[in-house]
């Protein structure tokens, strides 16, 4: 059976953008990469309850800009901006001699965000809710929010079974091989008493038409 390629990585440069936007020479590349990893882990751990979907990192000279996509921006910003200042001060200890700018972006439809759906299912599994119920409820909410299709997968000792297995549930269409298809992908882990359970979610949000077509239309109009 063929293995599934990461839907985001497959579409980078086609309809998706990089989550890290910076350039570095050989000497600094590894340091920047490790720094990015530490920043992402810290923000995710520190603001897990706020529902952080993804983090974009932009670098320029001695400045780092973070675009944090979250379902609950108020939880990160805090009262009078205290939360965001506290986060900035903590991050300043991770990155030395660099100014940090934090931009909070609200996720308008968290029910249709793959990463947030995966984390929600994982949280329910940790609360001992049946995995089938958790998956089906998430699928129903996603379809009501207006997505074209959704697929979920849970892997591990489901229901405390002796032998680990994987169960899939899906609704709508998920064209994984179509590059112009806007497929959102999320992964989370649930720590249960029987061990870890991996949760994967694919969400199809519709087709993104290539920009080249729009350019051709403009050329025809000008002719």
UniProtKB/Swiss-Prot annotation:
Gene3D superfamilies in alphabetical order: 3.30.300.20, Ribosomal protein S3, C-terminal domain
Pfam families attached to this UniProt entry: KH_2, Ribosomal_S3_C
Domain KH type-2: 39-108
A GO CC annotation given for this chain: cytosolic small ribosomal subunit
A GO molecular-function descriptor: rRNA binding
Keyword terms, alphabetized: Ribonucleoprotein, Ribosomal protein, RNA-binding, rRNA-binding
GO biological process: translation
Family designation: Belongs to the universal ribosomal protein uS3 family.
Record-linked HAMAP family: Ribosomal_uS3_B
NCBIfam families cross-referenced by the UniProt entry: rpsC_bact
Assembly notes: Part of the 30S ribosomal subunit. Forms a tight complex with proteins S10 and S14.
Role summary: Binds the lower part of the 30S subunit head. Binds mRNA in the 70S ribosome, positioning it for translation.
PANTHER family: 30S/40S RIBOSOMAL PROTEIN S3, SMALL RIBOSOMAL SUBUNIT PROTEIN US3C
Protein name (record): Small ribosomal subunit protein uS3
Species assigned in the record: Clostridium botulinum (strain Langeland / NCTC 10281 / Type F)
């Amino acid at each position: 059976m063929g293995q599934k390629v990461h839907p985001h990585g497959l579409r980078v440069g086609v309809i998706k953008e990089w989550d890290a936007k910076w350039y570095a020479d050989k000497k600094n590349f590894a340091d920047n990469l490790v720094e990015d990893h530490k920043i992402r882990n810290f923000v995710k751990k520190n603001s897990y309850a706020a529902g952080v979907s993804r983090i974009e990192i932009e670098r320029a000279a001695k400045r780092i800009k973070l675009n944090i996509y979250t379902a609950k921006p108020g939880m990160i910003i805090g009262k009078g901006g205290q939360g965001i200042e506290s986060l900035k001060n903590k991050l300043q200890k991770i990155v030395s001699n660099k100014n940090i700018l934090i931009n909070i972006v609200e996720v308008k439809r968290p029910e249709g965000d793959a990463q947030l759906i995966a984390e929600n299912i994982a949280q329910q599994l940790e609360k001992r809710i049946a995995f089938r119920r958790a998956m089906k409820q998430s699928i129903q909410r996603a379809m009501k929010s207006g997505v074209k299709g959704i697929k979920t997968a849970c892997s591990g000792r489901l229901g405390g079974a002796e032998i680990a297995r994987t169960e899939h549930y899906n609704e709508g269409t998920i064209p994984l091989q179509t590059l112009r298809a806007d497929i959102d992908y999320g992964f989370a882990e649930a720590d249960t008493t029987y061990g870890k359970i991996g949760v994967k979610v694919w969400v199809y949000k519709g087709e993104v038409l290539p920009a080249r077509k729009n350019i051709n239309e403009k050329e025809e109009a000008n002719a």
